[in-house]
Swiss-Prot record:
Name this protein carries in UniProt: Histone-lysine N-methyltransferase, H3 lysine-4 specific
Post-SET domain ranges (all copies): 1225-1241
Domain notes from UniProt: The RxxxRR motif forms an adapter helix that bridges the nucleosome and ubiquitin.
Organism expressing this protein natively: Aspergillus fumigatus (strain ATCC MYA-4609 / CBS 101355 / FGSC A1100 / Af293) (Neosartorya fumigata)
Superkingdom of the source species: Eukaryota
Function field: Catalytic component of the COMPASS (Set1C) complex that specifically mono-, di- and trimethylates histone H3 to form H3K4me1/2/3. Binds RNAs which might negatively affect its histone methyltransferase activity. COMPASS recognizes ubiquitinated H2B on one face of the nucleosome which stimulates the methylation of H3 on the opposing face.
Localization per Swiss-Prot or TrEMBL: Nucleus; Chromosome
Annotated gene: set1
EC number of this enzyme: 2.1.1.354
Amino acid sequence: MSRTSAGFADFFPTAPSVLQQKRVRAPRDRPCPKDRPEDQLHVQDDNGQSSCSPGTSAANVSTNGSPPSVSVSETGTGVENSGCKLVGETNTDITGTDTSILSASLAQCRATQVNEARFDNLTPVTNAESSPPRKLSPHQSKSVEVAEYESNKFATDESKLAATPLHTPPTPRSQTSRSGVIKGCKLVYDPDLEKRSSKEKRRKPQYVDFVVNEQDGCSPDPRLSILNYTRGAGCKQKTKYRPAPYRLKQWPYDTATTIGPGPPVQIVVTGFDPLTPVAPINALFSSFGEISEINNRTDPITGRFLGVCSVKYKDSTSFRGAGPVPAATAARRAYVECKKEQRIGTRRIRVELDRDGAVSDRIVARAIESQRMGHKKNIVGEEAKVEPQAKKNEPPPTAPKGPSRSSTRPVAAVPEGPRASFLKPAIPSLIEETPILAQIKRDPYIFIAHCYVPVLSTTIPHLKKRLKLFDWKDIRCDKTGYYIIFENSRRGEEETERCFKVCHMKPLFTYIMNMESQPYGNPNYERSPSPERLQAERRERAERERLKKEADLDLEEEKKQRAIDLDPCREVLALIVRDLKDKLLEDVKSRIAAPTLYDYLDPDRHAARRRALGIPDPEGIRRHTFRLDADNFGSNNPRSFLPGDRSFSPYGLNILALPRIRKARRLNRANAAFLDERRKQPVRRKEVRPLYHRLQQLHDVDDSDEDQRTPFSRDIDEQDSRPPSRMSSRSSISDDGEESEPLDGLAPQGKRHESRLLGLEYEDSGNTLNEAVDGYSRHDSPGLSSTRKRKRVAEGIDVRKRPKEESERSQLNRSVEAGDTFYEESQHSEAAELGTVKPENLAGIGGKFLGRVEDRSINEDGEKENMERLHIESAIQGANLGIQQPLPDESTTTKSHEDPITEIEWGVSNDEPRPTVVDDETIILDLDGWQNLVKDEEDLCFLRHVLDGQSRSKVGNLSAWAWRQKEIKALNRAGESGPVHQETRIPDYYVCNPTGAARTEGRKRILESEKSKYLPHRIKVQKAREEREANAKSDPHASSAAEAARISAAKTISKSTSRSTRVNNRRLVADINAQKQALPMQGGDGDVLRFNQLKKRKKPVRFARSAIHNWGLYAEENISANDMIIEYVGEKVRQQVADMRERQYLKSGIGSSYLFRIDENTVIDATKRGGIARFINHSCTPNCTAKIIKVDGSKRIVIYALRDIGRDEELTYDYKFEREWDSDDRIPCLCGSTGCKGFLN
């Protein structure tokens, strides 16, 4: 084997690493004790093989005591990395006494392994030329040990680079096993660390070796666990994790190369005291650059400062003797510098960059909203505090009242500092308004009703966590409950079933999840129709739209043609012809047809025909004179015009009793044909007073019956339409106990109007007693004869008077003969006025006369008429007492039983009890209705019994309250009083929705013309206007005098107003001059002062409901002509934006227009951001005008007074819309002035 090459230690023996290795090797090189047996040099392992000691590294030692033999290969190519044995074909025995030789040979072997390793031969080759091993010198032994250490150091690294051929035989385990290897040493004692005197003898350092068994401590290569590491897959470069993008240096703004907005040149300042003047703010921020504009923002309504200031810079070529300072640099510097706790006064300010003014507008809006809410809370608190004091210090009722709240201006609250934090935006609610079930089609879902788990937005996150084990898609909720929605697939259906089985009736907090599973989606969902059906519906819809469009076009064409053919003269002529036709037809009916019918129906002309047919002649029905509607129009009976009268109905019409023409009383003959029978006529009250008058004692008992008459029941509930009442039908015999009166004496004074029952007309000498009888019985059924009707009425009245004393009947029976004689005399004496009357006709009349004497009221026409009536009454009474009443025949009785309806309606009950008064269910139960319903003590007792459980209302004085309620009713019903059948309301004011509710109605626009019909304030103004016009037409002199008085009063007011205005202007100028002296003189101060002057010159106005349209603007004080009133404030937008917004407002339902044009390209939009000036309405004759002025280089709209305006007068100006010709969408004008043009456009 060749000699080993020199190592690093041989060439560099003084190197620090070589010296260190020598110090480490020093303890190991110590000689072993001589008495140590040789067999201790070898340690036998578990397999029976001897391993080398630490001093020798490796040896082949026999176990039977023979000298050990070492086999060393001459070439050294058969040495393995992990073993320490040397295998060769030529073996040489080495004695065990000389261990240094073994170590030297081992070192030589390792050096050869390191430096002369060959990879092409695995089998050691025996070479005869190789020299045998020789004994090494001591110097050579040391060098070998150093080489051994170096070989141990680099053995592991060299072995990794060695390539193993494919046909390498496996190394036996006996060859790979090695003993413990010294990896290093540990210093256990260091004499340098001892705190001893230097004179003492110092000990040597002590070391302990680290011995590691390579077989146990060799760990596997971790790189081999990487997949495809040997192929290079593990060597891919990994990307670097970057949690944030790199901060690159911003490019400087260059106007030549930059597209888009430049850096901000404006800042917004907040946090300072709102009462801080502009001077300190200006002084602070002018130190950063030249200021172009500074604006201390104010409330557009109240005008108080908000504590928000906008500062805008401009480029400066030379700022304070230095170089140029761009506006963007100044704004940036101000923003950076003011971050360092800059203060104005005692408050710390906050500065933000504001590129286009959006930041300042947002802050101003929040500040205004917060101040509004704070002001409302303060007002509520002050009212709550002041209320108990006001109750204690109430003035007496007779004390004069102070001005109303609307006439005094509310005191503005002291402005407060800005809020530290603005209102946080509201968290959007997760509860959907639209029903979710209608949106779910085929998606599986589980429903939890709101009755089991309350619907709250905060419950959804907890429910999601509760169901996190299931694969749901979404969880939504509405007012009905929660919907857990899954995927629309087979897996989603399975998840639905699994979730239902696991969580059904399981707790969620303190609630139970009662679930409803729908794995196949909404059960009520219907699929969309087929394409053929959709196409058919589209065709039908298109056809309907086409037909509708054609109909509309035809209608429009017809309207245009009518407008072209319209001729006012022809229309007037058509109206005249139509009126003449009606008048001619009326004259033909009254002058030709009526007399012809009367002549044709004259009983004398049909006498022969009646005799031929066996019909008896009509007696007591014929009228001797010709008159038209005598019983209705010419009669003195005021009840003939009431709705309850049936004289015009077919049931009450008798052919033989047709009316005759005669002069009517209290009626214009020219208007007789145009009267309506339903029209209410002024009537006299009855003498019977209702219970209300009895309780209140409004009238004395001794009052005249004709002076005080109150209705007993409603106006149409007459004696002719209901059974007679005992209270209203008294006998001529007094009820105070007197049983008889002189037969030929005069009637009592209180019964002078008893003949009005019969409808007798004494001024006409042709009226007879038969007419009176017919006038009473003409409401009976037309199938009954007049004789039978008279007998039935007489019988009914006699039955009604049965409870009277029996002495009345005996007196009537004893006076039959005297009655006959009296009848004959009265018949001859009054033949000219009463005509011929048979005894059987008068037999059934007397009781009727006495029974209904006090049921009618009359108008006294003179003493002569009264005497004639009294004379007739005495004659009738005598006839009643002297003529015996015949019994009714069987035919009359049978007829009365065959027609019970007529008996119940018109007759008197003689078989069973009947109600005296039939209540009308259609009467509105207000105060008058209840007073009409309660007629006696019995009704009052029943009413008290019904109202026992109700609590009493405190109305104060009952009489005053009742009077006030009736006055309110009369005021709302145009003077009408008494019981009514319709509620007191404005006609067509409450219109029912077709769908039943306003929420289900679609959006529809109500025309202004329709609003003017039912809005109360518009109706009031319309009535006042009509009344004014009517007064002007009736009395033009009075209207002109009132106008002159109004003008003179306005002049007086305007003079005083002008004087006060001049005083206020002087004070204003003085304030402005004081501000000029206080502020530092700079370029923009003049514009600021002018704008402040414009703000202070505005007049106090208010907005309220207007009779013209919605809201209106009203003056709170007198305003002189040409005075500035208010500025039209709003958002300034371009014309294109204004057009787009107008369409959006119309779609959203905002019908009012608040867009005011400044010029061709600029429009002021005050719809959502504006002052109260937007409420000013249009008028064709306005009292204001709008002017466009320039303030601070910007155009502003200001409202000026055209004339003197009084207090509480509405402000109007002409909108000046462009005239639109041939337009169907014209806006109607509702100003109602004398010069109204009808339309705005």
